[in-house]
């Protein structure tokens, strides 16, 4: 469900499956474990294999963004499937979470 690739002060996390009410607590815990590294300043979420996300997922992402922002960091997403990208745009998430078309370092 989640793969993690650190690279200096940034990391890429691959989230797969669904990010809904049922999966949100587990994904939140996993992302919080990644963010325990306080030197991490940028988190990229690779959502290529994320098939569904609801408001619970939005909450998870915004909560982790707040953690990063509290230390001067940022978050971005990449490789979104059309339904997830539509939710991003309808909810306005693209205004606070950057959208990358491809990862700078290549795919995981």
Can you name each region flagged by the protein language model?
Residues 54:
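ABC-family nucleotide-binding domains
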Residues 1-51, 66-108:
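STAS-like cytosolic regulatory interaction modules
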């Amino acid at each position: 469900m989640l793969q993690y690739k650190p690279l200096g002060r940034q990391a890429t996390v691959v989230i797969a499956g669904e990010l809904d009410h049922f999966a949100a607590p587990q994904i939140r815990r996993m992302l919080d474990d990644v963010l325990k590294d306080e030197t991490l300043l940028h988190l990229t979420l690779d959502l290529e294999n994320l098939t569904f996300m609801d408001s619970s997922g939005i909450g998870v992402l915004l909560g982790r963004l707040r953690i990063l922002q509290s230390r001067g960091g940022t978050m971005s997403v990449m490789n979104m499937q059309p339904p997830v990208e539509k939710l991003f745009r309808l909810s306005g998430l693209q205004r606070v979470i950057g959208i990358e078309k491809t990862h700078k370092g290549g795919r995981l």
